[in-house]
C-alpha cells in the first residue's frame, strides 16, 4: 500500500515537472518576439489588435495567435504600466488560456499575469469576464489594467450592483468586463425573468477568469444565489377573500370532477366572482393572479378533505396526511398556493412565504461558461475538487525568486487562556523591536478578544474584520510598515499586497501569527502567504490549544495521549513537534474530505434543477426572441392537454369518462351547454380527442381574430405563455425545495435520497409541463381579448398589480357588509384580515 501511494505521488510530481517544462518552452517562444515588438512604434503596436482580430476572423485560432499576442501585451504593459511580465507570469498566463488554474504565490503578480489571457480571449469578440470577490477589487483592477487594454484598443466595462440595466448592458457588451461573482449570477437569473429581449443585459457566457478562484468555486460553492419576492399581507388577505367567495357558491356555480381532482367555475360562478371582485372579465389576461387564488380556494373547499388529506394541529398549523401511512408529514407544505388556501379555509393564520423566482449555485453558474479558468496562491490542496467538478487542472507555477519566509512548527497549549497569553507576549516582543505583525483569526469574536488584550498590554494596532471592511485595503497596505500590528480574520484583505516598509527586511520581514488552524489547510496557507512575497524575508507561526474547535473535533484525544507519554502535565506546557503538525494536518484533511463530499452532494441535487432550469430558460428565450406566430406551439399545447385529460378520464367507465370530459371541456375549452353526452357516445377515445381539438381550434381562431393584426397576436401569445411559465416555474422551485428536505430523511430508511430526489423531481417536472400547457390552453380559450395587451416586466409585478387593483374595492365592501356579532375571541376576524378576532376588530 505504501509503495502504491509513493508511486502515485511520484507520478503526480513527474506530471507537474513535465507540464512546467512544456510551459517554459512556450514562454521562451513568447520571449523570442520581444525584440520585434520593442522595435515597433506605439501606433504599430496598437495596430496589432486589429490585425489579430482580422486573422482570427479569417480562421486562425487563439492558440495560433497566443505567442505574438502575449508578446504584444508584455511590450504594452512595459510602455503603459511600467511593468514587464516575468517568464513565470507568462507561464501562468498560458495555463489560464488553457482553462486551468495556475497556483501562483502571493505577490507573484497574478493581476499582471491575467492581462495576457484576457487580451487574447477578448480578440474573439465574444466577451471576457474577469471575476473578483468584491467591487473594490473589480474597480481597482479595471482601472489599473484598463489603461493597458484601452491603449491596445479593447473596451473595458465594470459591472456594479448599483448600475442600471442599460449601464450593465453596456458593461457586458465591452470586450472585457470586470464584475463580482454574485453580480454575474444575479444578472443571469434576472435575464431569465425578463419578458423582452431588449431587457436582457448579458451576452452568452464565453470565458471567465476568476480571481481567488478557490474562494469562489470552493468556499462559496454551496451558496445559492436566490431571487425571491415576499408574499405580503395583501396577498394573504386575498386567500381569505377567495375563500369567502367560494364558501358562498352553490353546486351550480362550479364544475367538479372528483376522479381527476379538478374543479372550475361554471358561467354562474364566473358571474359571481366578477361581481365580488368588481371585474369586467375574470379570465382577462390581466387577472391571471386572481384566477390562481380562486382555483386554490375551490380545491381547498371542495376537493381537499379534513382528516383525510390534512388536519390542523394544536398550534393551528395545517399538516399534510401521508395517504400511505396515515401519519402527518412534518415540514411538508402543498405547493402552488394550495396550502395557504387550506389555511384560509380552516381560519388559521396564513403563513407568509417568500417565493423563490429563480436560483442557481456558483457551481452550476460557472460551469456554463465555454471556458473557465482562475488564479489562486493556494489551489493544489483542492485539486481533486477542481478536476472532478469543473474539469480544471491546478498547475503550480515556480516563484520568480526563492521563498525566504521561515515557517515555524506549530505551538500547542493546553487551554485557550495560555495560548492567547503566549500570542500577546510574542506580538508585544516583536512590536517592541519594530517588526510588523499580522495576527490572523478565524472569527470576529477572536479578533475582538485579542484586540482587548493588546490594548491592555499597551500595543497599538489596527483591527480588520467584517465591522470595518470598507477600510480593508488601506489597513492591509500599511500592515508591512515598521512597528505595525494588524489583526485580521483569515480571509480579509485578499487581493491586496502587503509591501514591506523601510528597514523592515533587516528586522526579519512581516511575521504572520495564526491564532488557530482553520478547517482547511488552504486557508492556513493563504494566511502564511501574506508574508514573504517576491523573495522578501518573513516568518509564520501558528498557536494552537486543545480547546480549539478543530482540535476538539478531530485531534485532542490523540494529542492528549501524546502529551501523557511525554509527561507533559503542567498547565503551561507547550508542545512543538513535527508529529503535532502532521496530526493537525490529518485532522484538516478529514474536514476537507467531509466538506468536499457535502459540496458534491449539493451539486448532485442542483444538477437535477440545472437540467430543468436550462429547459425552461431555453423555452423562455425561444418565446422572448420569437419573431413569428406562436400558434403552432400553442395549438400543440392544446392538443396535448386534451389528450391527457381524455386519457385520464378513460381510466374509468366510458359513461363516467364522458361526463368528466364534458365538465372539463365546458370549464376550460368551450362555452357551457355546447356539448352533451350524445356528442360523444358513438366515439372512441381518439375520436373524442379529435372532436374536442377541432372545437378548441375554432375557439382559438375566434380569439385571435379579435386581435386584428399580426403584431398584436404575437404580443398576446408571448404574454400568455410567459405569465403561465413564470408562475408555474416559481411554484416548482418551491416544490423541489420541499422535496429535497423530505427525501433527506429517507436515508434512514435505507433509500438513496439522491436517487429518490431525481426520480420524483422528474415526475414533478413533467407534471409542471402538463400544468403549464393546461393553463395556457384554459386562458387562451377563456381570456377576454382587449386592445391594450402589453407585457408586464415580470409575472411577479403582474401579480402585485392585480392584488393592488382589487384590494381597495374589496376593503370597502367588506367593512360595509361584515357583522361582528357572536364572534368568539379566538375565531378568525370576519373582516378577512387573517388575524384572530381578539387581535383585530375584537381588540378592546
From Swiss-Prot:
Its cofactor is Zn(2+). Gene3D superfamilies: Helical scaffold and wing domains of SecA, P-loop containing nucleotide triphosphate hydrolases, SecA, preprotein cross-linking domain. GO terms for biological process: intracellular protein transmembrane transport; protein import; protein targeting; protein transport by the Sec complex. It comes from the Bacteria. It holds the Pfam family SecA_PP_bind. It is a peripheral membrane protein. GO terms for cellular component: cell envelope Sec protein transport complex; cytosol; plasma membrane. May bind 1 zinc ion per subunit. SMART domains: SecA_DEAD (SM00957), SecA_PP_bind (SM00958). It catalyses: ATP + H2O + cellular proteinSide 1 = ADP + phosphate + cellular proteinSide 2. GO terms for molecular function: ATP binding; metal ion binding; protein-exporting ATPase activity. Its main location: membrane. It is found in: Cell membrane; Cytoplasm. Keywords: ATP-binding, Cell membrane, Cytoplasm, Membrane, Metal-binding, Nucleotide-binding, Protein transport, Translocase, Translocation, Transport, Zinc. Zn(2+) binds at residues 829, 831, 840-841. Coiled coil: none annotated. SUPFAM superfamilies: Helical scaffold and wing domains of SecA, P-loop containing nucleoside triphosphate hydrolases, Pre-protein crosslinking domain of SecA. HAMAP family: SecA. Monomer and homodimer. Part of the essential Sec protein translocation apparatus which comprises SecA, SecYEG and auxiliary proteins SecDF. Other proteins may also be involved. Belongs to the SecA family. Part of the Sec protein translocase complex. Interacts with the SecYEG preprotein conducting channel. Has a central role in coupling the hydrolysis of ATP to the transfer of proteins into and across the cell membrane, serving as an ATP-driven molecular motor driving the stepwise translocation of polypeptide chains across the membrane. This is Protein translocase subunit SecA.
Amino acid at each position: 500500500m505504501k509503495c502504491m501511494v509513493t508511486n502515485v505521488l511520484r507520478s503526480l510530481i513527474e506530471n507537474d515537472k513535465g507540464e512546467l517544462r512544456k510551459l517554459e518552452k512556450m514562454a521562451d517562444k513568447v520571449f523570442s518576439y520581444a525584440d520585434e515588438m520593442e522595435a515597433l512604434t506605439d501606433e504599430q503596436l496598437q495596430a496589432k489588435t486589429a490585425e489579430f482580430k482580422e486573422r482570427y476572423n479569417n480562421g486562425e485560432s487563439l492558440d495560433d495567435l497566443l505567442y505574438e499576442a502575449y508578446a504584444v501585451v508584455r511590450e504594452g504593459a512595459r510602455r503603459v504600466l511600467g511593468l514587464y511580465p516575468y517568464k513565470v507570469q507568462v507561464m501562468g498566463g498560458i495555463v489560464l488560456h488553457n482553462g486551468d488554474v495556475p497556483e501562483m504565490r502571493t505577490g507573484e503578480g497574478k493581476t499582471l499575469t491575467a492581462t495576457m489571457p484576457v487580451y487574447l480571449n477578448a480578440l474573439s469578440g465574444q466577451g471576457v469576464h474577469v471575476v473578483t470577490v468584491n467591487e473594490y477589487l473589480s474597480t481597482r483592477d479595471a482601472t489599473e489594467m484598463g489603461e493597458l487594454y484601452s491603449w491596445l484598443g479593447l473596451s473595458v466595462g465594470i459591472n456594479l450592483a448599483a448600475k442600471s440595466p442599460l449601464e450593465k448592458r453596456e458593461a457586458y457588451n465591452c470586450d472585457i468586463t470586470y464584475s463580482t461573482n454574485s453580480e454575474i449570477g444575479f444578472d443571469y437569473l434576472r435575464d431569465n425573468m425578463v419578458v423582452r429581449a431588449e431587457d436582457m443585459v448579458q451576452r452568452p457566457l464565453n470565458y471567465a477568469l476568476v480571481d481567488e478562484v478557490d474562494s469562489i468555486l470552493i468556499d462559496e460553492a454551496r451558496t445559492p444565489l436566490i431571487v425571491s419576492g415576499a408574499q405580503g399581507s395583501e396577498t394573504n388577505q386575498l386567500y381569505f377573500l377567495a375563500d369567502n367567495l367560494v364558501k358562498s357558491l352553490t353546486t351550480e356555480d362550479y364544475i367538479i370532477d372528483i376522479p381527476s381532482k379538478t374543479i372550475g367555475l361554471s358561467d354562474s360562478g364566473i358571474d359571481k366572482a366578477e361581481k365580488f371582485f368588481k371585474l369586467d372579465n375574470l379570465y382577462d389576461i390581466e387577472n391571471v393572479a386572481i384566477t390562481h387564488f380562486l382555483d386554490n380556494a375551490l380545491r381547498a373547499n371542495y376537493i381537499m378533505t379534513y382528516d383525510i388529506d390534512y388536519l390542523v394541529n394544536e398550534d393551528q398549523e395545517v399538516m399534510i396526511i401521508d395517504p400511505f401511512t396515515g401519519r402527518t408529514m412534518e415540514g411538508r407544505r402543498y405547493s402552488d398556493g394550495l396550502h395557504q388556501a387550506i389555511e384560509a379555509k380552516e381560519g388559521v393564520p396564513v403563513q407568509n412565504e417568500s417565493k423563490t423566482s429563480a436560483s442557481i449555485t456558483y457551481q452550476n453558474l460557472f460551469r456554463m461558461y465555454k471556458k473557465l479558468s482562475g488564479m489562486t496562491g493556494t489551489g493544489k490542496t483542492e485539486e481533486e475538487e477542481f478536476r472532478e467538478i469543473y474539469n480544471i487542472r491546478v498547475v503550480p507555477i515556480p516563484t520568480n525568486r526563492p521563498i525566504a519566509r521561515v515557517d515555524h512548527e506549530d505551538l500547542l497549549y493546553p487551554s485557550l487562556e495560555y495560548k492567547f497569553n503566549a500570542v500577546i507576549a510574542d506580538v508585544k516582543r516583536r512590536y517592541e523591536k519594530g517588526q510588523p505583525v499580522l495576527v490572523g483569526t478565524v472569527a470576529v469574536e477572536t479578533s475582538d478578544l485579542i484586540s482587548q488584550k493588546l490594548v491592555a498590554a499597551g500595543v497599538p494596532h489596527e483591527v480588520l474584520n467584517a465591522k470595518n471592511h470598507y477600510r480593508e485595503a488601506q489597513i492591509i497596505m500599511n500592515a508591512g510598515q515598521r512597528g505595525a500590528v494588524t489583526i485580521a480574520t483569515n480571509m480579509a484583505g485578499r487581493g491586496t499586497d502587503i509591501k514591506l516598509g523601510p528597514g523592515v527586511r533587516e528586522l526579519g520581514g512581516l511575521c504572520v501569527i495564526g491564532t488557530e488552524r482553520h478547517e482547511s489547510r488552504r486557508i492556513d496557507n493563504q494566511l502564511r502567504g501574506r508574508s514573504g512575497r517576491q523573495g522578501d524575508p518573513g516568518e509564520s507561526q501558528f498557536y494552537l490549544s486543545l480547546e480549539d474547535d478543530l482540535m476538539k473535533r478531530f485531534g485532542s484525544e490523540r494529542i492528549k495521549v501524546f502529551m501523557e507519554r511525554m509527561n507533559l502535565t503542567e498547565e503551561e506546557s507547550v508542545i512543538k513537534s513535527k508529529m503535532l503538525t502532521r496530526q493537525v494536518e490529518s485532522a484538516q484533511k478529514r474536514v476537507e474530505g467531509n466538506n468536499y463530499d457535502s459540496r458534491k452532494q449539493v451539486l448532485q441535487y442542483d444538477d437535477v434543477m440545472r437540467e430543468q432550469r436550462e429547459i425552461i430558460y431555453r423555452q423562455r428565450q425561444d418565446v422572448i426572441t420569437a419573431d413569428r406566430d406562436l400558434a403552432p406551439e400553442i395549438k400543440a399545447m392544446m392538443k396535448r392537454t386534451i389528450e391527457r385529460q381524455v386519457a385520464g378520464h378513460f381510466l374509468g367507465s366510458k359513461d363516467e369518462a364522458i361526463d368528466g370530459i364534458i365538465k372539463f371541456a365546458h370549464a376550460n375549452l368551450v362555452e357551457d351547454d355546447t356539448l352533451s353526452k350524445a356528442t360523444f357516445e358513438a366515439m372512441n377515445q381518439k375520436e373524442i380527442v379529435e372532436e374536442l381539438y377541432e372545437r378548441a381550434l375554432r375557439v382559438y381562431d375566434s380569439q385571435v381574430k379579435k386581435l386584428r393584426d399580426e403584431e398584436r397576436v404575437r404580443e398576446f401569445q408571448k404574454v400568455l405563455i410567459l405569465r403561465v411559465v413564470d408562475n408555474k416555474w416559481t411554484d416548482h422551485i418551491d416544490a423541489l425545495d420541499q422535496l429535497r428536505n423530505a427525501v433527506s430523511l429517507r436515508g434512514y430508511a435505507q433509500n438513496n435520497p439522491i436517487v429518490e430526489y431525481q426520480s420524483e423531481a422528474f415526475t414533478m417536472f413533467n407534471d409542471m409541463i402538463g400544468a403549464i400547457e393546461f393553463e395556457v390552453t384554459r386562458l387562451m380559450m377563456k381570456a377576454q381579448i382587449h386592445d391594450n395587451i402589453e407585457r408586464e416586466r415580470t409575472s411577479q409585478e403582474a401579480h402585485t398589480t392585480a392584488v393592488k387593483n382589487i384590494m381597495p374595492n374589496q376593503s370597502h365592501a367588506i367593512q360595509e357588509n361584515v357583522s361582528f356579532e357572536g364572534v368568539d375571541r379566538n375565531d378568525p376576524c370576519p373582516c378577512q384580515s387573517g388575524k384572530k378576532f381578539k387581535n383585530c376588530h375584537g381588540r378592546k
